[in-house]
Amino acid sequence: MSSSAIQVAKTATYLPDLVEVQRASFKWFLEKGLIEELESFSPITDYTGKLELHFVGSEYRLKRPRHDVEEAKRRDATFASQMYVTCRLVNKETGEIKEQEVFIGELPLMTERGTFIINGAERVIVNQIVRSPGVYFKDEQDKNGRRTYNASVIPNRGAWLKFETDKNDLLHVRVDKTRKINAHVLMRAMGLSDNDVIDKLRHPEYYKKSIEAANDEGISSEDQALLELYKKLRPGEPPSVSGGQQLLQTRFFDPKRYDLGRVGRYKINKKLRLTIPDSVRTLTHEDVLSTLDYLINLELDVGGASLDDIDHLGNRRVRSVGELLQNQVRVGLNRLERIIKERMTVGETDSLTPAQLVNPKPLVAAIKEFFGSSQLSQFMDQTNPLAELTHKRRISALGPGGLTRERAGFAVRDIHPSHYGRLCPIETPEGPNAGLINSLATHARVNEYGFIETPFWKVENGRVLKQGDPIYLSADLEDECRVAPGDVATDSDGAILADLIPVRYRQDFEKVPPEQVDYVQLSPVQVISVATSLIPFLEHDDANRALMGSNMQRQAVPLLRPERPLVGTGLETQVARDSGMVPISRVNGTVTFVDATAIVVRDEEGVDHSHYLQKYQRSNQDTCLNQRPIVRQGDPVIVGQVLADGSACEGGEIALGQNVLIAYMPWEGYNYEDAILVSERLVNDDLYTSVHIEKYEIEARQTKLGPEEITREIPNVAEESLGNLDEMGIIRIGAFVESGDILVGKVTPKGESDQPPEEKLLRAIFGEKARDVRDNSLRVPSTERGRVVDVRIYTREQGDELPPGANMVVRVYVAQRRKIQVGDKMAGRHGNKGIISRILPREDMPYLPDGTPVDIVLNPLGVPSRMNVGQVFELLMGWAAANLDCRVKVVPFDEMYGAEKSQQTVETFLKEAAKQPGKEWIYNPDDPGKLQLIDGRSGEPFDQPVAVGYSHFLKLVHLVDDKIHARSTGPYSLVTQQPLGGKAQQGGQRLGEMEVWALEAYGAAYTLQELLTVKSDDMQGRNEALNAIVKGKPIPRPGTPESFKVLMRELQSLGLDIAVFTDEGKEVDLMQDVNPRRSTPSRPTYESLGVADYDED
């Protein structure tokens, strides 16, 4: 295939840096966030006020990380840097100042690709979307159908304050969901007189009722108000005026306990039209009075007051890595502060130094906890470059301080008009997380306040101004403008052509003349996410199928020989580059050296820059990471040019699958219900062969009876089984292993107690030689095979950190080539997925008039009801492109160039292809897009013409090799004694309620009985049945299932007198077969067989 690519639509497809959201946030943390946190804790004073400890936050420094990224991955270490900060200890009495640089902990650093290496594994911190701090006005209906209004002041941290109106026109306030307090009681407690409040309100007559109500309760002074406040907030404690004063002060006016944050202050100022400076982050009297005033205006429906929509993106903000990390550092410093205060009090004042006061442990623990176990710190999805990129751009509403799946209603998950150009309306998971986990749109960025912005071109007097940089608007700013879509037709000068333009204004659609348009959207792609924007002809697909297509592209396995799509969207190059999977030239220069492992570029000054390539490394998902050079020695390169292809890349573009010849027709029922019929060519030519690398690990531990040994001398193992092991008993690199082969030989000492006297005598004569050991080697699990590509040995002597009790750890990496086979899952880019049902010899496949057999036969019934017609456009466009020997880039939403544009474009291309000599059969005007296929088995043409073409098809990571599973005897659950579930637990197949109904309907009583008893949880019965099978005797009658006993016990624990009786009325003791000191074997016990037990034959 030639590398020329024809761009069909002329839309700007350059995108901003796609990992910017991660990098910029971490950079902010290092430059500002960390300093801010350190300085907010300074100074720490002891309880007597004599000593003060100051952190000089701006003078913190980071040491060089101990290991670089590759080394950290290899050693299972964390890629982190040590933090040092200058501390000053001031003695107030003597005026003495001690200054010292103190170690305060390790900070994991972000790699260039926006990830973190924690304990050797690459992790990503997902962005979280939460409700923005600020003031929110809502209305509620009481049970009589009357509307009441309320206002909540939500801080970044601290107590919530909620004002409410009621049916008697009284104002109340709640602090943190406690009991209602008359609003005027709070005003008086804050030291405001009646006139102070009344002067501030635009409609004081409404408020006077609340003043009267407070007076009626006998609360007329500040002291009485403080007492009342204390009673309501701390019921059951003796109230005091000073207590009330302190409570109010700490709850709302103490910066340590109450913080609106920059965002909260900005939002409150904006909503209530205040001008309080950014630095005031606690509540002020002005905030409270303005909130009351706004609430009264809402109640009276005057003064332009409006309610807030909490799902609007102007009221939700994104917390990225930097801020999440900052919050975690605050938790650590809080714990540290307590320790420092205690040490100041306990220690000798004169001899104390800052280093003795500061203990790095709490901060280290807080940071470790965040990266290791937070819901937002996730194991990176590395299946392919797109999966990696999408993971870094993910935005989750779950996590600490966010929503939970169970509580999230429909409104939160729904698409909101303000998502336009900010969050993708398509890419979200199916299932319980739908709508809670979103993806950032292609052009969106997060501003300094954490609100998502999207770019527009300015429009003046009906002319689109495309000079300079576009203007970024956040959701609440955009609401006030009239915004036209990106596909409005303009002339060469930028003047809008139509008389009336559809625009979005205040979350509604209207049509206005061009002069009234304020902004135009940048590109049609800016509404959707990166994964969705890789789907060609997206506009012809139903949204549900586009969602599946976006999600399945992330599950495509990198193939042995990737191939770029014939029909792309023009964003493939940037996705490959920004994912970090492809090495990029850092300078302008010339390539001076290339081999499989390194590329050297010499810049204009004559300095060499080396780029080392990844070779056959294992990804987090066991796929293979490998880089192949695409430049040659002597090639000139420029900054930013791709030097090598990564996994699932070709020619610097992302290439997730293969372009294969597809026919839409039924074939002997083999493509019923989305099944896929494929040609043997895909297997033989390795089109869909992928490399998977599995990691096996074994540790030699210190046991009570002595150390385990990694050795070649394994008892009762034939010499030929040891052929591939080296002198230490470890497999050699390059060996081919089958299931059951030894990878690492290991022996464990056996117990001494069970030794007969003659053994002891031999031991005494020949010394320790005859020591008893057990074979405990690492073997290749069943169903696995492959070639050993790497062996790593970790010991204490080399300075590796090993788990407690281990003397040595050995890791073996085995790579396997997996060809495509029946049971594997495949999919196109339009949500058209299926399982391979049969692999047909190529001579039996239907073939084209020129004799080419097709590669895949899909069911045509998969298209109409699912409404993903994009696949048909792709098919025919690919057919034309393949015959014209070119590649095509189709930008989504091309109907801006005229109605039915996609169809016209495809038809034009097909006619062009048919003009070539000998290719006129490609396009039949009577049946455009269809060909007469011939049956490979009989040589007869098929009845009807068939749609045939080239489509980009992916092999997904759900491989049948990893799913197929069988169980003979295995572990049981502790309580119910039923077999466990799942392949990892060696589980059984669940026989559920519906399966039981099916057997009941057939009257298959004995089959059903044994399925529910001896094959499941009748403990005695299953042991007896096993012995009977081994000895060849008839299987005894089943007993009582364990789960029935559990049910009986549960009913008895509810206080019900329930028991089981025989027909004669005699009670059955269910526990008779259970030993009182029952230690159930979790596996069945085999009785030893005597000679007499064997049958004669």
Curated annotation (Swiss-Prot):
GO MF annotations, alphabetized: DNA binding; DNA-directed RNA polymerase activity; ribonucleoside binding
InterPro entries: DNA-dir_RNA_pol_bsu_ext_1_sf, DNA-dir_RNA_pol_bsu_external_1, DNA-dir_RNA_pol_su2, DNA-dir_RNAP_su2_dom, DNA-dir_RNAP_su2_hyb_sf, RNA_pol_bsu_bac, RNA_pol_bsu_CS, RNA_pol_bsu_protrusion
Keywords: DNA-directed RNA polymerase, Nucleotidyltransferase, Transcription, Transferase
EC numbers for this chain: 2.7.7.6
Gene3D superfamilies: 2.40.50.100, 2.40.50.150, 3.90.1100.10, DNA-directed RNA polymerase, beta subunit, external 1 domain, DNA-directed RNA polymerase, subunit 2, domain 6, RNA polymerase alpha subunit dimerisation domain, RNA polymerase Rpb2, domain 2
Gene Ontology biological process terms, A to Z: DNA-templated transcription
Cited CDD domains: RNA_pol_B_RPB2
Keyword presence, Cell division: no
Gene Ontology terms: cellular component: DNA-directed RNA polymerase complex
Enzyme class: transferase
Reaction equation(s) it catalyzes: RNA(n) + a ribonucleoside 5'-triphosphate = RNA(n+1) + diphosphate
Subunit organization: In cyanobacteria the RNAP catalytic core is composed of 2 alpha, 1 beta, 1 beta', 1 gamma and 1 omega subunit. When a sigma factor is associated with the core the holoenzyme is formed, which can initiate transcription.
Function summary: DNA-dependent RNA polymerase catalyzes the transcription of DNA into RNA using the four ribonucleoside triphosphates as substrates.
Name the record gives this protein: DNA-directed RNA polymerase subunit beta
Origin species: Synechococcus sp. (strain WH7803)
Origin organism lineage: Bacteria, Bacillati, Cyanobacteriota, Cyanophyceae, Synechococcales
